[in-house]
Amino acid sequence: MVNSEEIADGFEPKPVSRSYSGDSSHDRSLSDLNHAAEDLSDKLKNVGLNEVTKEQSEKMMSVSESNGGLDSNAVVTINQEEEEEEEDRDGYGYGDGWSENESENVYPVRPGAEDCSFYMRTGSCKFGSSCKFNHPLARKFQIARDNKVREKEDDGGKLGLIDCKYYFRTGGCKYGETCRFNHTIPKSGLASAPELNFLGLPLRPGEVECPYYMRNGSCKYGAECKFNHPDPTTIGGTDSPSFRGNNGVSIGTFSPKATFQASSTSWSSPRHVNGTSPFIPVMLSQTHGVTSQNPEWNGYQASVYSSERGVFSPSTTYLMNNSSAETSMLLSQYRHQMPAEEFPERPDQPECSYYMKTGDCKFKFNCKYHHPKNRLPKLPPYALNDKGLPLRPDQNICTYYSRYGICKFGPACRFDHSVQPPYSTESSQAIVEPPQVSANGNESDGWN
C-alpha cells in the first residue's frame, strides 16, 4: 500500500510490506503502480489543471482494476491531494467570491503590512503584485471607504459650527456656498448699527482709530470699516488733516488746537497746493471790527478773523489805511488774543525766519525754531498796491504776480508788484458797440 503523504509531496513511494503471500505478478503490478504515481505527481506540478487530474485518476482506476483492485485506496488519496492543492490556491487569494476575471488583477494581500494608501483611495495600485503594502479585499475596501466618508462628514459638521470671520467682518465671503465655515447670523447675535459721524463713517469707541481717516479725513470702506472714525471735534492730532466727504469733495481742514463750541464749528479753507497759502488781503470796517463786503470784492479778500485759530488777525491794508493810534490798539488786541502755545518759544534754537518776516508760521506749535512773543507784524516802509502787495520800483517785477495776479509771499515778497496782471477784469472786458443803421435802413453788425 502506498502512503498518501508521500504521493502528495512528490517523493518516491516506498513499498509496503504485506502479510499475505504474494507472487511475482503482484510485485510487477506494484512497481507499475509506483511509476504511474510518479508520472502523475510530475504532471500535477507542471500543469495543475483539474481536467488532467481527472484523466489521470481514471487511468489509475483502470490500472487498479486490472490488477485485481488491490490499490484502490491509492487512487482515493491522489484525489484528496488534488482537493488540498485547490484549497491552498484559494487561500492564497483566489477565493472569497472572486471570479476568474477578477482574479487576474488581484493585488497582494499582506495582513501584517500597512494598507496601501493609494489603493484605499482609488481601488488600484500602479505597483501591482510587487507592492509591499497590504491590499484588502473588495468588501474591506468598501468598509474603509465608508468610514473615511463618515469621518469627513463629521469634520465638516464640526467646521460648520465655527463662524466664518470674513463673512461677519465684511458681510460677504469670497468662497460663497463652498465655504466650510458657518455663514448664518444668529438672531440673538445681531449687533446694532454703529453711530455715524457727520461724514457717514462709523463711530466705534472701543476700536482702533482708522489710520487712513486720521491722515486724509476720508475712508474708502465707508460704513463697513471696522475702525473708529471720531468726529473732528475730538481729534487731537499733530497736523491739520484735510477732510473730504465720501464722494471726494473737499470740505476743509481741521485744526486740533481750535476752540469748538456747541453752536458753531470753526473750519479753515484748504491750503494751497504747494503747501503755502497765497497772500489774501482783507478789509475791516472800523465799527466793532466787523468785516464789510466791498462791492468791488474780487474773491481774494477774506475775513479779518482767522478761522483756523479763532483769533483776530490784522491785515496789512488796514494797518496802512488807519492812524498809528488805531493801529497800536489793534495790534495790542491781536497780541492779547493770540494763544501763547500756538507759536512755541525756544530760546536755545534759532529764530524762525518765516515767523520773523510775516508774523505767522504754518507749522505752529510743531515748529522746532524760536518764536519770540514780542514779535509783531511790522509796518512795511514801502507802499502797497490795491491787493496789499509791496511796490518796489527799484526791484525786478515779481514773475508770479505778473503771470497769475497773486503772490504767495504777500507783503514779504522782495520783488515789485506794480505791473497790471494779465487776468485783470478791466483788460478782459470786451467793448460791444450798438448796431449801426445803414443807408438802406438795415442794421449792420460792423463786420460788413
From Swiss-Prot:
This is Zinc finger CCCH domain-containing protein 43. Keywords: DNA-binding, Metal-binding, Nucleus, Repeat, Zinc, Zinc-finger. Residues 1-106, 424-448 are annotated as: Disordered. Residues 63-79, 437-448 have a biased composition (Polar residues). It is found in: Nucleus. A zinc finger (C3H1-type) spans 110-138, 158-186, 204-232, 346-374, 392-420. Residues 24-45 have a biased composition (Basic and acidic residues). Residues 80-89 have a biased composition (Acidic residues). It comes from Arabidopsis thaliana.
